[in-house]
Amino acid sequence: MDLTVINDRGEQVASVAASDETFGRDYNEALVHQVVTAFQANARSGNRAQQTRAEVSASTHKPWRQKGTGRARSGRASSPIWRGGGVTFPNKPNENFTHKVNRKMYRAGLAAILSQLAREGKLKVVESLGIESPKTKLLAGKLKSMGYGKVMIIADAIDDNLWLSSRNLPNVYVVEPHQADPWSLVKFGNVLITKAAIKQFEEMV
């Protein structure tokens, strides 16, 4: 699989050969869906919670006597059928959202996404993304001249200048190959990758 190499103006200047095992796989939609949803599920913090009828702060006084009023019997205001009462089957923070995906499947899904992006022309290669100083304006200007607004940058090594320049850009995500995840690849759509990072991906996937 040949990948397009571009310069600072977004113009194609060369091509680089990449492994078909990593960048030339067929797109497996079911596998990609599985690894993306598993990644999202595993990222959940599990911080949702509701209160049971035992945990709701309410009076334990019986609202009215059991018989003779003509109304339905009622024991206490924390009943789940009352407004402001507890929840019958509440969510709790200790729920386990983990989805297990085998390492081989995860890497195959990652390779399928990279391959599809390469076929669609959304994965481009650059020699390097060196930034002279930690200035957001410098990186934003360079990406704009290359024709990118929203992009995921995969660099073989992230120096302080690149990291500091990118962290205030909401539509720019900078990672090293081992940090790349399927959800971000799908979300950002456009990927800039350095030549050295390609080799790291091939060894990893």
UniProtKB/Swiss-Prot annotation:
Residues 62-74 have a biased composition (Basic residues). Keywords: Ribonucleoprotein, Ribosomal protein, RNA-binding, rRNA-binding. One of its GO terms (cellular component) is ribonucleoprotein complex. It comes from the Bacteria. GO terms for biological process: translation. Residues 43-96 are annotated as: Disordered. GO terms for molecular function: rRNA binding; structural constituent of ribosome. Residues 43-60 have a biased composition (Polar residues). Gene3D superfamilies: 3.40.1370.10. It holds the Pfam family Ribosomal_L4. InterPro entries: Ribosomal_uL4, Ribosomal_uL4-like, Ribosomal_uL4_dom_sf. One of the primary rRNA binding proteins, this protein initially binds near the 5'-end of the 23S rRNA. It is important during the early stages of 50S assembly. It makes multiple contacts with different domains of the 23S rRNA in the assembled 50S subunit and ribosome. Belongs to the universal ribosomal protein uL4 family. HAMAP family: Ribosomal_uL4_B. Part of the 50S ribosomal subunit. PANTHER family: 50S RIBOSOMAL PROTEIN L4, LARGE RIBOSOMAL SUBUNIT PROTEIN UL4M. This is Large ribosomal subunit protein uL4. The gene is rplD.
